[in-house]
Amino acid sequence: MRFRFCGDLDCPDWVLAEISTLAKMSSVKLRLLCSQVLKELLGQGIDYEKILKLTADAKFESGDVKATVAVLSFILSSAAKHSVDGESLSSELQQLGLPKEHAASLCRCYEEKQSPLQKHLRVCSLRMNRLAGVGWRVDYTLSSSLLQSVEEPMVHLRLEVAAAPGTPAQPVAMSLSADKFQVLLAELKQAQTLMSSLG
């Protein structure tokens, strides 16, 4: 069976297995747990002590707690990525075996944060490194008594790339012929146009 929150694919087996774990909690505690997971997804950090308190009644082992956080993170982020509305998500979770009141609690939480979550995921997705700075130089030899032939101009690029926000930038240097530089520039402009059309 295909589910919209899974991108119109089958639900992963590990998610199916953890649905029964979610059902062991009360719907109120599930909602509070969802709030914590949403904070983490929005980059605000997660309070593990609070999570342990919320799952204490259900007598979860540490593996169950981690699995519960992972499955909620998957469900909420996946639903946001695929623009699934709360009602559809609730229906799909019930089809997977989550009790109706649990699904309603989870979806209420999801609907409250759906828009900021989608915005945050959009900012974070498809981003591998951050460009911190660019330097360039063109070497062009007009003539030389030492060379038999004059070489074509060379473009030397130096990119300062940070792996993540707040990390120090690492230099990446490269040298390109004028032709290769023109191809690189054209492809970068094409990529920029495509990305800006996506919003």
From Swiss-Prot:
Could you name the Gene Ontology cellular component terms for this entry?
A: cytoplasm; cytosol; intracellular membrane-bounded organelle; nucleus; plasma membrane
Tissue specificity? Ubiquitous.
Give the location in the cell.
Cytoplasm; Nucleus
Q: Which residues cross the membrane?
A: none
Q: Note the subunit structure.
A: Component of the commander complex consisting of the CCC subcomplex and the retriever subcomplex. Component of the CCC (COMMD/CCDC22/CCDC93) subcomplex consisting of COMMD1, COMMD2, COMMD3, COMMD4, COMMD5, COMMD6, COMMD7, COMMD8, COMMD9, COMMD10, CCDC22 and CCDC93; within the complex forms a heterodimer with COMMD8. Interacts with RELA, RELB, NFKB1/p105. Interacts with CCDC22, CCDC93, SCNN1B, CUL2, CUL3, CUL4A, CUL5, CUL7.
**Name of protein:** COMM domain-containing protein 4
Gene name linked to the record: COMMD4
Tell me where it mainly resides.
cytoplasm
Boundaries of each COMM domain copy? 130-199
- What biological-process terms (Gene Ontology) are attached? signal transduction
Q: Which UniProt keywords apply?
A: Cytoplasm, Nucleus, Transcription, Transcription regulation, Ubl conjugation pathway
Look up the domain of life of the source.
Eukaryota
Q: Which InterPro entries match?
A: COMM (IPR017920), COMMD4 (IPR037356), COMMD4/6/7/8 (IPR047155)
